[in-house]
């Protein structure tokens, strides 16, 4: 058996064995990396090199944006913006059949993009919208399914921490281009879910909302304009080159603090230490994942694992369509069992070179990969948003899955559109910043 093949077996064998034993993901990655490096280096050298690669990976200016965006998201999450966005979404949903379901989708798109967390969107928006839909006579399983399926849209609509992680692991893909590239796919995901929700609502003859008076509509817009301005200020500044993504993330924290503490007064000064601590813990978890995954990426490159996997996939077919479908299928399966961040960190170094050899732009591939893995957080057996959505909706999984199935189909169709129509991702970066790959 060749050293390269043995490295593949050891790396993924140890990793999945430890995952099966419920060892934390970052620890599983680190131990699998060390086990693989030991095949070619003595113990002392293996430990030193692995630690060195982990620390070097974190020595990145771009990664400074992550803790600030995480903190800004936590502040906005607790700053009373959910209800303001829901009121605006009620106006935007209009008098469509199942308008409250459409409102849920729109609110998740808005809230998720501001908070940067699909789980936070599922909890904050779903907790309020679920009760409103229940009182309006909606099936609780249907209401929960709409909330669950739409909460990942905020991971595509910037600012997105996921894109920052992808930018780092992919060798410096433009964060600004990734942010712009996520808009249309995120909106398409939301629209696909709204179409399915609308068809179900029409068949079930769900009630239509009363017409919203003009003064109420204007009031809802004015209430939501300040939180939404965060997106305009941060993304606009990054795209125009006024400031970097890291500087933009710091501005987001200052703006979020101003809204939550001074304008809305939903957060007291005594609440800030707890918010800072929670943000530090979340950031530490993410940074540990990035460090360990970067060590694994180096170990894979050292053993030429990406090259071996590339040769194996290309041996199956030279057809670009078949290869992209194969990559999507593998990522869908990975998403069933692994969270988005470690999946991006582990599989980007494997699949991105293959995609680039086929002429796929790294920004387009990053959006495709993120969209694909978004489905993993709303599917069993480990989908975090699926179980949070069931919890806040006070429903069992069996009540939700029948409604989720057509939404999964809509998401897969949209994924295929994003995969095979690159301009869905690349149009805005090319239009607004002259991106050329």
Functional labels for PLM-detected ranges:
Residues 1-437:
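Alpha-helical transmembrane segments of multi-pass membrane transport proteins
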């Amino acid at each position: 058996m060749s050293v390269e093949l043995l490295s593949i077996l050891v790396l993924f064998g140890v990793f999945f064995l430890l995952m099966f034993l419920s060892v934390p993901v970052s620890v599983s990655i680190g131990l699998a990396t060390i086990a693989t490096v030991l095949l070619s280096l003595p113990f002392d050298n293996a430990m030193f090199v692995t630690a060195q690669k982990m620390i070097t990976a974190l020595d990145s200016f771009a990664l400074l944006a992550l803790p600030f965006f995480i903190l800004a998201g936590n502040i906005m999450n607790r700053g009373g913006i959910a209800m303001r966005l829901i009121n605006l979404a009620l106006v935007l949903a209009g008098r469509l059949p199942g308008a409250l379901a459409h409102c849920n989708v729109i609110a998740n798109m808005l809230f998720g993009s501001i908070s940067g967390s699909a789980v936070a969107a599922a909890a904050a928006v779903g907790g309020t919208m679920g009760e409103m839909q229940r009182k309006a006579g909606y099936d609780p399983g249907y209401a929960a399914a709409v909330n669950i399926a739409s909460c990942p849209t905020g991971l595509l609509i910037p600012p997105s921490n996921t894109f920052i992680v992808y930018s780092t692991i992919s060798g410096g893909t433009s964060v600004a281009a990734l942010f712009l590239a996520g808009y249309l796919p995120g909106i398409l995901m939301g629209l696909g879910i709204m179409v399915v929700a609308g068809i179900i609502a029409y068949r079930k003859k769900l009630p239509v909302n009363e017409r919203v008076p003009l003064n109420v509509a204007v009031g809802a817009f004015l209430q939501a304009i300040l939180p939404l301005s965060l997106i305009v200020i941060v993304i606009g500044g990054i795209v125009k080159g006024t400031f970097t993504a890291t500087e933009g993330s710091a501005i987001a924290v200052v703006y979020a603090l101003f809204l939550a503490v001074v304008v809305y007064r939903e957060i007291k000064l005594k609440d800030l230490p707890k918010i800072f601590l929670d943000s530090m813990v979340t950031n530490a978890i993410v940074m540990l994942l990035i460090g360990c995954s970067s060590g694994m990426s180096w170990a894979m490159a050292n053993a030429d694992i990406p090259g071996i996997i590339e040769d194996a996939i290309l041996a199956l077919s030279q057809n670009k369509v078949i290869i992209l479908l194969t990559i999507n299928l593998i990522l869908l399966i990975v998403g069933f069992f692994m969270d988005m961040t470690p999946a991006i960190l582990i599989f980007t170094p494997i699949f991105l070179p293959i995609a680039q050899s086929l002429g796929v732009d790294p920004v387009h591939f990053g959006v495709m990969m993120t969209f694909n893995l978004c489905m993993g957080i709303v599917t069993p057996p480990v989908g975090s948003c699926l179980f949070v959505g069931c919890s806040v909706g006070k429903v069992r999984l069996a009540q939700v899955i029948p409604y989720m199935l057509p939404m999964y189909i809509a998401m897969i169709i949209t994924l295929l559109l994003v995969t095979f129509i690159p301009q869905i991702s690349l149009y805005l970066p090319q239009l607004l910043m002259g991106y050329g790959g």
